[in-house]
């Protein structure tokens, strides 16, 4: 999914984030790598960092069953009098995977997040007029000791968890991938997911965009 690397978007100042590894930790922390770090990195914890754009691109890659797109803002260039100089075609790569049926498993799991009885974003399925698959999340700002309990009210606001939601729609013919992060807001299901629903409603229903 290209985590830890720049996406290649045609905007300045992009950072690649961190996808930690044994080599990265030795170089940057001068510390050994532990087995548990492999596990927590797989769910985005530890030293791993990613931008909302990277999360949206990873979500789009899942929706497209492995096609990883390079994001771009400029679609074409033209002169002052309107003459077209260059039409810019989207670039993409295919993510290698041993069993391509795993894409369907992931998509179904994300679908159940919205439509399943125990889905963490099942409230989004209230009068939903398009199919939506997603994933809620909570990004920790700092780590707790094993014996400590996270109680938001007892923690300074700037240190509280970030709320996260990422998803795509429609499921059958994906057009939009979205990633929402609400800083220090807590629950992704109650804070970030409703914002995603508002934006997607605007895109598909209130002001539909012709593709």
Residue ranges and their predicted role:
Residues 83-92, 195-211:
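Short, gly/Ser/Thr-rich active-site loops of penicillin-recognizing serine hydrolases
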Residues 186-187:
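Short beta-strands and strand-coil junctions in structured, solvent-facing domains, enriched
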Residues 51-57, 191-198:
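Short amphipathic alpha-helical face segments that pack within enzyme cores
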Residues 1-177:
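Beta-lactam-recognizing serine transpeptidase/beta-lactamase-like catalytic domain environment
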């Amino acid at each position: 999914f290209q985590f830890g690397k720049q996406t290649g978007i045609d905007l300045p100042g992009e950072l690649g984030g961190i996808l930690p590894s044994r080599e990265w930790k030795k170089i940057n922390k001068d510390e050994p790598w532990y087995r548990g770090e492999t596990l927590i990195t797989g769910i985005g914890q530890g030293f791993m960092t990613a931008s909302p754009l990277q999360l949206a691109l990873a979500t789009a890659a899942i929706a497209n069953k492995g096609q990883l797109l390079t994001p771009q803002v400029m679609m074409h260039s033209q002169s002052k009098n309107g003459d077209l100089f260059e039409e810019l075609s989207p670039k993409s790569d295919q993510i290698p995977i041993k069993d391509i049926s795993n894409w369907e498993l992931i998509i179904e799991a994300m679908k159940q997040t919205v439509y399943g009885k125990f889905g963490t974003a099942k409230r989004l399925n209230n009068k939903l007029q398009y199919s939506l698959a997603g994933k809620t999340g909570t990004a920790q700002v700092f780590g707790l000791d094993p014996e400590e309990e996270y109680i938001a009210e007892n923690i300074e606001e700037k240190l509280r968890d970030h709320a996260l939601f990422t998803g795509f729609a429609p499921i059958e013919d994906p057009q939009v991938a979205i990633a929402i992060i609400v800083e220090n807001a807590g629950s992704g299901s109650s804070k970030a997911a409703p914002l995603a629903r508002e934006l997607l409603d605007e895109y598909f229903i209130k002001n539909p965009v012709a593709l």
